[in-house]
Curated annotation (Swiss-Prot):
Protein name: Dermonecrotic toxin LiSicTox-alphaIA2bi
Compartments where located: Secreted
List of glycosylated residues: 283
GO annotation (BP), single: lipid catabolic process
Length: 306
């Protein structure tokens, strides 16, 4: 009898702890923060940045003349203090990323929950944007989502530098639908990264037929200074109750003082070359009760309510 009683007590203890953890998680009113490792273009860098504290990464995607995604490559110039020349073939990178974001894989990194693809569409003509979106979708479907069969679980943000390239979004969506996987759009968000006027960005989304799943970026290379005026405009839109923005991130944030300024402004994400710096600031007494590192249970398309 005693072993059975002991077993019951152990089970009750485990269930009680789980329930308490669940209640505490739902009661946590801190803003979740996405720490975005900047310019992660080689497979080996995925582990490097996640191990430094990143829960998301940004990867550059270059295109060939026929609008095929070709390399994960930035090139010169890039941020001060970084190597600009690391690269992989795009599909090889997707396979490595899939390994890092698929539960059960030997290379799985549970903390890696979101990927921003910085789409270098500046090499394309405006009339190639739709085709670029279609080809991007086909590559992601095959090499990252594994044709819908236990592929990578990370959320994906398609970051486009040119408002005129909004047809890329429709091409991407149409291709997934044509290939029988429209449900994967639930894992896809959007960003226009050209620091355009917020109103102009909103108009581009209207043309693209997009409402929701919107991250708004603002920033500049770490070699230069940039104020937070436009960040605050984006945050005002996000918090207005009738804006089109769900989340705001700031780049490139490498210094503690800049991190504090961005958090004080109310951003949801910071893109950085030094994730450990952001982690250190989040653990400071002034911030640890207001912010926390986002987990997979945090919806990246949901506007945070205080």
């Amino acid at each position: 009898m005693l072993p059975y009683i002991a077993l019951i007590l152990v089970c009750w203890s485990v269930l009680s702890q789980a329930a308490q953890t669940d209640v505490e998680g739902r009661a946590d009113k801190r803003r979740p923060i996405w720490i975005m490792g900047h310019m992660v273009n080689a497979i080996a860098q995925i582990d490097e940045f996640v191990n430094l504290g990143a829960n998301s990464i940004e990867t550059d995607v270059s295109f060939d003349d026929n609008a095929n995604p070709e390399y994960t490559y930035h090139g010169v110039p890039c941020d001060c203090g970084r190597s600009c020349l690391k690269w992989e073939n795009f599909n090889d990178f997707l396979k490595g990323l899939r390994s890092a974001t698929t539960p059960g894989n030997a290379k799985y990194q549970a903390k890696l929950i979101l990927v921003v693809f910085d789409l270098k569409t500046g090499s394309l003509y405006d009339n190639q944007a739709n085709e670029a979106g279609k080809k991007l979708a086909k590559n992601l479907l095959k090499h990252y989502w594994n044709n819908g069969n236990n592929g990578g679980r990370a959320y994906i943000v398609l970051s486009i530098p040119d408002l005129n390239h909004y047809p890329l979004i429709k091409g991407f969506k149409d291709q997934l639908t044509q290939d029988g996987h429209p449900e994967l759009m639930d894992k896809v968000g959007h960003d226009f990264s050209g620091n355009d006027a917020i109103g102009d960005v909103g108009n581009a989304y209207k043309k693209a037929g997009i409402s929701g799943h919107v991250w708004q970026s603002d920033g500049i290379t770490n070699c230069l200074l940039r104020g937070l005026d436009r960040v605050k405009q984006a945050i005002a839109n996000r918090d207005s109750g009738n804006g089109f923005i769900n989340k705001v991130y700031y780049w490139t944030v490498d210094k503690r003082a800049t991190t504090r300024d961005a958090l004080d402004a109310g951003v949801d994400g910071v893109m950085t070359n030094y994730p450990d710096v952001i982690t250190d600031v989040l653990n400071e007494s002034a911030y640890k009760n207001k912010f926390r590192v986002a987990s997979y249970e945090d919806n990246p398309w949901e506007t945070f309510k205080k």
